[in-house]
A protein has these predicted regions:
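Glycine-aromatic micro-motifs
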Residues: 5-246
Length: 246
């Protein structure tokens, strides 16, 4: 059976011996505490391409892509705008056995802003929002059919997010030419001040026009809008939400 037709889970464990470990890869996979899952959203992500395989990170540059085109076979390109950019989140969602190629990409005429909702683990998530002239540096996760179903479950399709085809995405590497999909928050964007959205400082952008607002300040705004603006610290609020989830 040709390698390209084999399921990722059936691939030999040592298949990735030809790949080079990503520099400082372990720092991107450090397990987060429950509080830090919300406090540190959307987490650190490499600026270039990487391969998550068997719980480890490998460099995925153009040379490796050209040598191993099979890693994209039967996969869907999904633009990651928030925590899904980060290896620690992909590993948490898909486990140590997962094999996921991730490649850098830019989204044009949009920024990544805080969404008007609170995640079940108390992070204020994010979504893409039109912003003429703005270019954001993101990445694309190449998911197989089972991984895509799992991603849909974690994103709350039809409740928290819609699954949509993305426009104006430009890949930074030569990868398969196919549609790019993504997730759009059904709640819309957080009104940070006078109807102005708030951008995420962790997302690199050129031509950004919206103010950059930290996770703590975004959560404070959500608390203000929902009548939960009290004396609790951000960490205390997170802990209470995670306990209650109501």
């Amino acid at each position: 059976l040709r390698l390209a037709l084999m399921k990722a889970s059936a691939l030999p464990h040592n298949l990735f011996s030809a790949f080079v470990a990503l520099a400082h890869g372990d720092t991107y996979l450090t397990t987060l505490s429950d509080i830090d899952r919300a406090r540190l959203y959307p987490y650190s992500a490499p600026s270039g391409g990487y391969l998550l395989a068997n719980g480890a990170l490998y460099d995925l540059d153009q040379k490796m892509i050209d040598r191993h085109r099979w890693i994209f076979d039967d996969r869907v390109a999904v633009l990651s705008v928030g925590s899904n950019r980060a290896p620690v989140q992909l590993r948490r969602k898909f486990g140590d056995a997962a094999i996921i190629p991730v490649t850098p990409a830019r989204l044009f005429d949009c920024d990544i802003v805080h969404a008007a909702m609170l995640g079940f683990y108390a992070a204020v998530p994010c979504t893409a929002f039109p912003c003429a002239g703005c270019i954001v540096s993101l990445n694309v996760a190449w998911l197989d059919a089972e991984q895509l179903e799992q991603m849909h479950r974690t994103e709350g399709i039809g409740v928290a997010y819609d699954y949509v085809m993305m426009q104006d995405v430009v890949h930074d590497l030569l990868v398969p030419d196919q549609p790019v999909y993504g997730y759009s928050a059904r709640s819309g964007v957080l009104d940070y001040a006078g109807g102005i959205p708030a951008a995420l400082p962790a997302i690199v952008a050129v031509g950004r026009r919206f103010p950059e607002v930290s996770q703590a300040d975004a959560a404070a705004r959500v608390r203000q809008l929902t009548g939960c603006d009290d004396s609790r610290s951000h960490a205390e609020f997170i802990a209470d939400v995670q306990r209650d989830k109501t």
